[in-house]
Structures are given as structure tokens and as C-alpha cells.
Amino acid sequence: MVQNKEAKPKRRGRPRAYDPQAALLRATDSFWSGGYSGTSLDEICAATGMNRPSLYAAFGDKHTLYLEALKRYWQLSLVATREALAAGDRPLGEALMRFYDGQLSIYFSADGLPRGCFAIGTATTEAVDDPEIRTVLAEGLRMLDADLEARLRMARDRGELRHDADPAVLAVLASAALHSIAIRARAGVCRAELREIARKTVCVICG
């Protein structure tokens, strides 16, 4: 009698493990450098070390990946903003300079290369025709203005600003200056010059 031998299952290689946060960070850097439309999936795969099936499984398509990168950027940027503005015992001028310095540290890469604001640099063009990107961009700007307004209102209530100062208007002024700094950083203006723009903005706000 011939015995049927069970075929031994073929051993498969262990699936390659990816760190989703590290991959998202590398994808963000790719978008930051080339923009959403200018960054190909092949470039993202090369940056993350993931093939297309793995990339799709982890993040979905390129659009979904970009939205994740944009949301993560706003989260980190707003954390830095709130940390800079949080200490109520710090004078307003000092708090605002900490805010601008924190953003400048984001606008320059670890090796000192200027890259500006990820949201302003990559999302503003796409937001014209893409409602999802437009929504995430607008919400990030709204939260930034709200955080600045809350700190400026506190300063007015403590007598650091004129009693008739409008915190909402001053918040928009502060964020508009930040966006100008971001664009200038992207254009290659040196960090010292950008910080001087921030300092003068703080002087105007504090009166």
C-alpha cells in the first residue's frame, strides 16, 4: 500500500515590517520637497522603502496618504504653538517670540535647509480644486488663529495690550506674518532675517 504523505507547507518569508509613523514622516518629507502633484508614487516608495502594495495596504492611495501627512503636520505644528503660548506668567512679547522661534525650527530641516511651512507650501495650490485638502487646510488655519486669539485675549485682560485692542484682529495679523515668514523661508531668506521679521511683528502687536 502506498501511503499518502502530507505535503509539507512551503515556508514563506516573514512579511517585511514597516513602522507606519516613520514611513509617514518620510512620505511627508517627499511631499514637502516636491509638492503633492510633483511627487510620484515611485518617489514615495523609494523614500519609505515600501513597494506599492504595501503602501496601499498601509495608507491607501496617494491622496489619502497626503491628507494623513497634512493632518499630522497640523497636529505637530499646533502642539508647538500651544507649548509656546501656554505659560500664562510669561510676558506676551516673549510668548510670541517663542511661538515664532518654534515655527522657524519647523521651517528649516535638521541640516539647515529652508523648506517653509508644509501646509502653506504644498496645500494652498491643491486646495483650489480639492475640497478635502481645502477643508484640512482651513481647519488648521482656524485652530492656529484661535490659539493666538486666546493668548492675546489673556494679554489684553491682564493689561499687556490696550483695553480696546481686538484679539481676533491681532491674531490674524500674527498668523499672516507667520505665513509670510514661511513663504520667505521657502524662497531662501536666511533664518536670522526671518527672525527679525518676527521680532518686528511682535513689536507692532505689543505696541
Where are these regions (language model features)?
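Helix-turn-helix
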Residues: V2, A22, R26, S30-T64, ...
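Hydrophobic alpha-helical connector segments
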Residues: E68, R82-R115, P167-A174
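Arg/Lys-rich, glycine/proline-spaced intrinsically disordered segments
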Residues: R11-P15
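Short, solvent-exposed amphipathic helices
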Residues: L76, E132-M143, A150
